[in-house]
């Protein structure tokens, strides 16, 4: 078994400065994620943290965004953060966990993957 981690950090202002936020959200987030963002009053901190989480997963997979689509990974916020990954596309991933944090103008996310050898 292999363990990999990925991390990402982003200034909230980078998301605030996006010209067409709705278009960006539809490109990056699933319907369920958009519903969660709406429940948080479209908080820029929430959007930034969730975006960082997707980037952190792509780094842990060593694919970057491109081979991994934004829609291949979903953050579900029911009882804490649960991350779902498209296992058809990434069958070697046995388990995934992530954490998102915010502090002032920054959001950061970290992801840990367990993979088959």
Swiss-Prot record:
Reactions that this protein is recorded to catalyse: apo-[ACP] + CoA = holo-[ACP] + adenosine 3',5'-bisphosphate + H(+)
Q: Which EC main class describes this enzyme?
A: transferase
The answer, when asked if Metal-binding is one of the entry's keywords, is: yes
The record's annotation in InterPro entries points to: 4-PPantetheinyl_Trfase_dom, 4-PPantetheinyl_Trfase_dom_sf, ACPS, Ppantetheine-prot_Trfase_dom
Q: Which cofactor does it need?
A: Mg(2+)
Give compartment(s).
Answer: Cytoplasm
Highest taxon of the lineage: Bacteria
Cellular component, GO annotation: cytoplasm
Q: Which residues bind Mg(2+)?
A: 8, 55
- Recorded GO terms, molecular function? holo-[acyl-carrier-protein] synthase activity; magnesium ion binding
Q: Which SUPFAM superfamilies match?
A: 4'-phosphopantetheinyl transferase
Q: Name one GO biological process term.
A: fatty acid biosynthetic process
Q: Print the keywords alphabetically.
A: Cytoplasm, Fatty acid biosynthesis, Fatty acid metabolism, Lipid biosynthesis, Lipid metabolism, Magnesium, Metal-binding, Transferase
Query: Where this protein primarily resides, as one coarse class?
Result: cytoplasm
**EC number assigned by the record:** 2.7.8.7
UniProt family annotation: Belongs to the P-Pant transferase superfamily. AcpS family.
Protein purpose: Transfers the 4'-phosphopantetheine moiety from coenzyme A to a Ser of acyl-carrier-protein.
In Swiss-Prot or TrEMBL terms, this protein is called Holo-[acyl-carrier-protein] synthase
Q: Which species is this record about? A: Finegoldia magna (strain ATCC 29328 / DSM 20472 / WAL 2508) (Peptostreptococcus magnus)
